[in-house]
Amino acid sequence: MALHIHEACILLLVIPGLVTSAAISHEDYPADEGDQISSNDNLIFDDYRGKGCVDDSGFVYKLGERFFPGHSNCPCVCALDGPVCDQPECPKIHPKCTKVEHNGCCPECKEVKNFCEYHGKNYKILEEFKVCVTLHTY
């Protein structure tokens, strides 16, 4: 038993000697912060507070400039304290609206139907009808 442990110890001591310095990359072992050479030293990130606004994609807007942040269709204005976005009171969508467009700041109803269509036949609202189900056996 002691012989197996001794062989394992020798094996562990021999393996590090087999690894060449070329096999070890500097990326494998990060250096201390003081030893690291940053490739981003030449990048300057400006502070835009009081000078403009930055959107999610990093685009910079001037003070007073109107823009649409992110996926919003509602406009914002770049102010000293950051973007000022007014959310208007949008009209309610009609309950029978079947086609809604989201092109502007508020959703708009483009089509209202007073009937229900099922398999090419029109029915009145709240009109009951039977659905025939045909079962196919193969």
Swiss-Prot record:
Q: Which residues form the signal peptide?
A: 1-21
Which keywords does UniProt give here? Developmental protein, Secreted, Signal, Synapse
InterPro entries hit by this protein: VWC2/VWC2L (IPR042979)
Supply one GO BP term. negative regulation of BMP signaling pathway
Where in the cell does this protein reside?
Answer: Secreted; Synapse
Residue ranges of every copy of the VWFC domain listed in the record? 51-110
Indicate the principal place this protein occupies in or around the cell. secreted
Q: Does the keyword Mitochondrion apply?
A: no
* A GO CC annotation given for this chain: extracellular space
**Tagged with keyword Metal-binding:** no
Q: How does it assemble?
A: Peripherally associated with AMPAR complex. AMPAR complex consists of an inner core made of 4 pore-forming GluA/GRIA proteins (GRIA1, GRIA2, GRIA3 and GRIA4) and 4 major auxiliary subunits arranged in a twofold symmetry. One of the two pairs of distinct binding sites is occupied either by CNIH2, CNIH3 or CACNG2, CACNG3. The other harbors CACNG2, CACNG3, CACNG4, CACNG8 or GSG1L. This inner core of AMPAR complex is complemented by outer core constituents binding directly to the GluA/GRIA proteins at sites distinct from the interaction sites of the inner core constituents.
State the protein's purpose: May play a role in neurogenesis. May play a role in bone differentiation and matrix mineralization.
Q: What is this protein called?
A: von Willebrand factor C domain-containing protein 2-like
Species: Macaca fascicularis
Q: Which gene encodes it?
A: VWC2L
